[in-house]
Curated annotation (Swiss-Prot):
Main EC class the enzyme belongs to: hydrolase
Record keywords: Cytoplasm, Exonuclease, Hydrolase, Nuclease
Family according to the record: Belongs to the XseA family.
PANTHER family linked: EXODEOXYRIBONUCLEASE 7 LARGE SUBUNIT
Stated name of the protein: Exodeoxyribonuclease 7 large subunit
HAMAP family: Exonuc_7_L
E.C. no: 3.1.11.6
One example GO MF annotation: exodeoxyribonuclease VII activity
Description of how the protein assembles with itself and partners: Heterooligomer composed of large and small subunits.
Length: 555
């Protein structure tokens, strides 16, 4: 006979089936026809979806808050997104929906997704292109229908929240074949005239067909080209259009756009008060810190130096500290002088070498130029001698004058450069001397502060030493008294437990005559045996004549 599995409770089996369905069918899409549609006052929708052969129960929780613009009815062809689960009390599996699309809208949704992906790939929805909204706009542009409730809601919110504002309304058609073109033209006109600081594109809720104008590519491109920040307030919170993705900010509703575009006067006042409180607190904290620091410095400056004869260890400490200070100062001065000499010698040497090189280059260039001019003059002179024409003589004189002027100008430039270098060298030498004097003053000041701090530290250490010494003596006295009392108590206990003191009160001690051990029980005695008895003032030998054992006896 085959071994059967243990029986399961119905609840356990139902839970297992429920977990299996929910884990394997967590996201499904079902297409069919609605039947038995029931919308409860709580906002939950219960329905059945069927085709020609099968039927499936379903539920859509909080349906009314998400799809209040259209109520489904029996016979509607829909596409439902959801998951499978089990309703345990009846043991029925059902679909729990989280999105419902009417079958006629499926093609539009597919077109919406395709256009969205293409425009996103082209960079129209890039986060880097988003413009920040002005904190306090002076003029607000609204592109919407002038006759709808949307513009009234926006104006009501603005009048309640904003202190001073201007609204420029550009009337357009928000539904139909011409709506997309009118809206894009309105955006272009607003950007061309530069009359507003921020734009709001608004429309009330509706089906996907009603809102399709805001999914047109022409509007997305107009928003992308806009230099004015744009807020998209199209439809309800659950409605999404391509206009929302392209805009700089998306508002869930037109009323929310009125709250986003203009910060309320009370909020501005609260922010200002918050900043003012922060500045006051920060200033108070800063002043308190500076006052505390000044008081601390004042205590240091007002400290009266005094010296009392310290112990020998404190003298050694002072000598050691002074020696350490002198050594440190000496080493610092020596290193400073060494660095200064190194800097001075190195820089002066490099400057000297540089000037010498420049002077050599100048002389060499001058000599080369002069030699070249001499050769040129000799050549010209030969030509003059050979040809003996007045034309060469007339050309030679201006060239000679020009050459002399150029040489004089070049020589003057080099002399000015040399003078400038010498001035820089003197300035640098002066700076080094000033720095040396400044560092020497700082070292002397540091030495004075260290001496003053040393005196203060020595006095403070001496007071701490005396205080610790006094505490040590007090602690030792307390410890001695405590051990003395403990010794007295233990001595009294030893005296009270001494057997000899017990014998003084009339008691006696028995010892075995042969083994010389104490007898504590009558069972260890025998008739005619000998025992020794010890009294207060002596011992005696006794013979046992009779032995009686007692079971228990209380005194």
């Amino acid at each position: 006979m085959a071994t059967s599995s243990p029986p399961q409770a119905v609840t356990t089996l139902t839970e297992s089936i429920k977990n299996l369905l929910e884990s394997n069918f967590c996201h499904i899409v079902v297409k069919g026809e609605l039947s038995n549609v029931s919308l409860q006052p709580s906002g939950h929708l219960y329905f059945g979806i069927k085709d020609s052969k099968s039927f499936l129960n379903g539920a859509f929780f909080h349906f009314k808050s998400k799809y209040f613009d259209r109520r489904p009815k029996d016979g509607d062809s829909v596409i439902i997104h959801g998951k499978l689960t089990v309703y345990a009390p009846r043991g029925q599996y059902q679909i729990v929906a989280h999105a419902l699309v009417y079958a006629g809208e499926g093609d539009l949704l597919q077109k919406f997704e395709e256009t969205k992906k293409r425009l996103a790939a082209e960079g129209y929805f890039s986060i880097e292109k988003k413009q920040p909204l002005p904190r306090i706009p002076k003029c607000i542009g609204v592109i919407t229908s002038p006759t709808g409730a949307v513009i009234q809601d926006i104006l009501r919110i603005l009048s309640r929240r904003c202190y001073q504002y201007k609204v420029l309304i550009y009337p357009v058609t928000v539904q139909g074949a011409t709506a997309a073109k009118e809206i894009s033209q309105a955006i272009e006109v607003m950007n061309r005239d530069k009359l507003v600081d921020v734009l709001v594109i608004a429309r009330g809720g509706g089906s996907i067909e009603d809102l399709w104008a805001f999914n047109e590519e022409i509007i997305v491109k107009a928003i992308d080209a806009s230099t004015i920040p744009i807020i998209s307030a199209v439809g309800h919170e659950t409605d999404y259009t391509l206009c929302d993705f392209a805009a700089d900010v998306r508002a869930p509703t037109p009323s929310a756009a009125g709250e986003i575009v203009c910060q309320s006067s009370q909020e501005q006042i609260q922010i200002f008060k918050s900043h003012l409180r922060y500045l006051n607190a920060h200033a108070q904290q800063l002043l308190a810190g500076k006052a505390k620091q000044i008081q601390q410095w004042k205590r240091y400056l007002d400290h009266v130096d005094f010296f009392r004869p310290p112990h020998q260890s404190l003298d050694y400490l002072r000598v050691s500290i002074e020696r350490s200070i002198q050594t440190t100062l000496s080493q610092s001065k020596q290193r400073y002088r060494q660095y200064t000499r190194w800097l001075q010698s190195d820089i002066l040497q490099r400057m000297t070498y540089r000037l010498q090189d420049l002077w050599k280059m100048i002389n060499l260039a001058f000599q080369n130029r002069l030699l070249a001019l001499k050769h040129h003059c000799v050549h010209i002179k030969k030509n003059l001698v050979i040809h003996n024409t007045q034309q060469y003589r007339q050309r030679f004189d201006p060239c000679r004058d020009q050459i002399h002027r150029a040489l004089s100008q070049r020589l003057g430039y080099f002399q000015q450069s040399l003078a400038h270098k010498q001035t820089l060298l003197k300035h640098f030498t002066t700076k080094i001397n000033q720095l040396f004097i400044k560092e020497t003053s700082a070292l002397n000041l540091l030495k004075k502060r260290l001496n003053k701090a040393f005196v203060y530290t020595v006095c403070e250490r001496r007071e701490h030493f005396l205080y610790a010494k006094e505490n040590l003596f007090l602690s030792l006295n307390h410890l001695v008294e405590r051990h003395r009392a403990k010794y007295h108590t233990v001595s009294q206990q030893l005296i009270s437990l001494n057997p000899k003191n017990v014998l003084k009160r009339g008691y006696a001690m028995l010892f075995d005559f042969n083994e010389n051990s104490a007898i504590i029980s009558a069972k260890s005695l025998h008739k005619h045996s000998c025992v020794r008895v010890r009294l207060q003032d002596g011992e005696a030998t006794l013979t046992v004549t009779d032995v009686q054992n007692f079971e228990t006896q209380e005194f």
